[in-house]
Amino acid sequence: MAQRKELLKAHAFTQQRLVAALVDRDPDNPTPPLRRLGIGTFVSILVAAVLVGGFALFGYLTKPSTNAWSQDKPVVIVDTDSGVVFFTLDGKTIFPATNITSARLITGGDTIVKATTAALASAERGPRYGIVGAPSQLPDKSTMTAFPLRVCSLPATKNVRYTVLDTHAPGVTSDTAIGLEVNNHTYLVVGGMAHLIPNGSPLLGNATSLKGTEAFLRALPQGQEVKPFSDATTGNKALRGQNPVGTIVYTGDQTDKASWNYYIQLIDGYSAISYLDAMVNNQTPTAVQASYVASNRSETQNTATPGLPMGPVTFTSTDTTKTSVCATYTADSANPKITIGDTVAGPTDTKATPAVATYDRVTTAPGGGALLRSLGTDADGATFLIWQGQKYGIPDLESRTSLGYASGVNIGTVQPALLSLIPDGLPAGIALDRTHANHPA
């Protein structure tokens, strides 16, 4: 007669076959049908337990120390519960700061710690210090990109244009010569440099002058005026040379104007000038043998207007009054490249009357900023933080170091006038330095 133990085994075997037949349609499957489900459940629970334990350990290790802020040196303290920024100079008394920028300037910015509100509850409090209006967040230096830097003039309505500035703009390779009309004055923009010319001058030919803004003009390097030759000896017989003083002459193949070299007859001989210098005099150049010019040169070998190319210049035939015109600076050139028709976003605040003293919009890379300095400034001299469409002056290397920008940041050098047109983030006379930050607010 079967024993109870054998009956139980037989019952279990029969039950397993019934379940296998129902689930797997195979009563002879030796593997229990729910085994994989059980193993999967067990492994999932085990992995979840490991993850929970790992996060718990991470939270324990990264939990702000209750007394990490109490050091015998200046420390910036960030309250992780409230977001309030404090600083301490002696590890005992803590002072609220108007912003992280001010706290870094006061302490030197070397040490920044986090603490909970409870950890700071027993600390002695001082008055609030800092620069009201200074940035409440500083861009990471890895996001600080100045070039390519682009200033664009955009059509708004008839005879109304906006001027915008973008850092970290797309690069350009082409360069276009244009005419620019601002405040009833006409300029040639050649090689990225603006030259004043007489109104009604033939230099532009049939090109349409862009009726631009003063802000766009001031963003360009200013070259010397291109004007007709004027001298008390004009028309007199020259001491050297066969032409009257002031005569424009050329050498080269008479059938190939591209080969012509231009000169002006001075009292003591011939002096080289550019194509545009020749054209502004509104004369028909006289052909002279190159050998004769070479043997009768003036002591003033070259009187061309500085910054102008010596050869012919073709101005764009595009109607610049109806499209964007941009000047793009790069790190390796003091003069920008001029492009026409770029797709550029306009200002978010579309005012009926665009700003004159500032750009209508200033944009940096998303989440980033830029550091700029004026042309001619020493390496350790004043720089400007461009952040959230405004500029903040940083007067010296010490202040820049406190803000974390002493090294690892490419500082863009730009024209002083360009820099002056970026809206100020602080009142006149206030800069990001320890002197201004270390005052009760």
Question: Where are these predicted regions, by residue range?
Answer:
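Short, surface-exposed polybasic-aromatic patches that bind anionic ligands, especially phosphate groups
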Residues: 1-441
